[in-house]
Structure formats: structure tokens, C-alpha cells
Amino acid sequence: MTGTAKVSIPKAQPHKVPCVYLAGDLVFRPNAIELFDELKEICKDAGVQGVAPFDGQEGVEEMAPGAETSLKIAELDRKLMDRCDGGIFCLDPFRRAPDMDPGTAVELGYMAAQGKPLAGFTTDGRMYPEKVRSYRKQAWGDALKPRFTKGGSGSMEDADGLIVHSEGFLQNVMTEGFIRMSGGFVAVDFSIQEAFRTAIKDLAARLNSQH
């Protein structure tokens, strides 16, 4: 007796759309909701799902400002980062200072420690030492000066004798450097949407190649 064996063809598994945490001082800006909506559309076009910090903060708007509310937000944001496959970070200077938003820097380090792919974007293409130089002049009326010792991460120091570090980087090397070590880069454009578009396109390609 002969016959044809039935071949079981496995069903194709649905493609999982990678989730990307959208981090930055954008949450503090007057048009935050509208801006995140724009960035989410750009994410969709790139083939990923953008997740804003607000997406995990249901009910927070009903809580009174204070330490308890702030800590709750930090807890909820951490849960969102744990769920996401990668992160994209705004490295714009914060509150007219040379450095980026410190909370965003913490989030960047947190996701870097998880080994997740990262990307960055900014509208300010000046190198970090130049940002420090401009800030010191405008805020304190002083200037940078050359260091007498060689080596380290900077050849200049400020009026307080602190090294102006991270030469060759847009921000502190511990932030931009972690992005580079994950395989990404920081995109620069005068338009925040275009800078984001360039960065998310690269991050999406890396994330989708893993799925």
C-alpha cells in the first residue's frame, strides 16, 4: 500500500513591530503632546512603534505636583523602558545650559546597560566644548583657558579649573559614546523632526534586522 505523506507547513509568525522609547526634554516643552504625535508618525513610517513617556503615565495628571508624583513618574517611565526594544534620545542643551536634560541622560544609561540599540538626535551641532565656552561667556562673563597638563579628554579648562571634557563629541562622551557603542549615532538638523527622522530610520533598520 502506497500513499502520499501529508506535509505540515508551519504558519508564518506575525512580524513583531519593534517598540522604541522616545526620550528627551521634549516632555517639558509647551507643545509636548503635539510634538510626540509627530514623532510617532515618523516612527510608523520607519517601521517601528514610538512610545512616549506620557503613554505609561495614565492617572498621573490627576496627582498633585510633589515628590510622590515625581517618583511615580520615574517608576512608570522605567517600566516603559523595560518594555521597549530600543531608545532614541534628544541631546539638545537643556535650560540654556551646555548639557542635555539629566533625566534623559539617566534613561540613556539605563537602556544602554540593558544592551538595547540606541540612537540620538539634536538641533544643536556645536561640539560640547564650544557649548561650554558659549555658556560660560553668557552666564558668567568669563572664558576658557588652555590646560597646562596634557592628556585626558580635554585641552581646555573653565574659570573654576574644571576640565572642559568630551572633545569631538556633541555632548558628554558618556551619553553620545554609549549611543555609538550600541551601533548608533547622533543625527543633527536645524529641524527637530528631520534630525529625528534620520536617527529613527537607522535605529529601525537595526531593530528590524534583529526580528
From Swiss-Prot:
One of its GO terms (biological process) is deoxyribonucleoside monophosphate catabolic process. It comes from Schizosaccharomyces pombe (strain 972 / ATCC 24843) (Fission yeast). GO terms for molecular function: 5-hydroxymethyl-dUMP N-hydrolase activity; nucleoside deoxyribosyltransferase activity. The keyword Cytoplasm applies. Pfam families: Nuc_deoxyrib_tr. The keyword RNA-binding does not apply. It is found in: Cytoplasm; Nucleus. Transmembrane segments: none annotated. One of its GO terms (cellular component) is nucleus. The lineage of its organism: Eukaryota, Fungi, Dikarya, Ascomycota, Taphrinomycotina. Belongs to the nucleoside deoxyribosyltransferase family. InterPro entries: 2'-dNMP_N-hydrolase, Nucleoside_deoxyribTrfase. This is Uncharacterized protein C191.05c. Keywords: Cytoplasm, Nucleus. Signal peptide: none annotated. Its main location: cytoplasm.
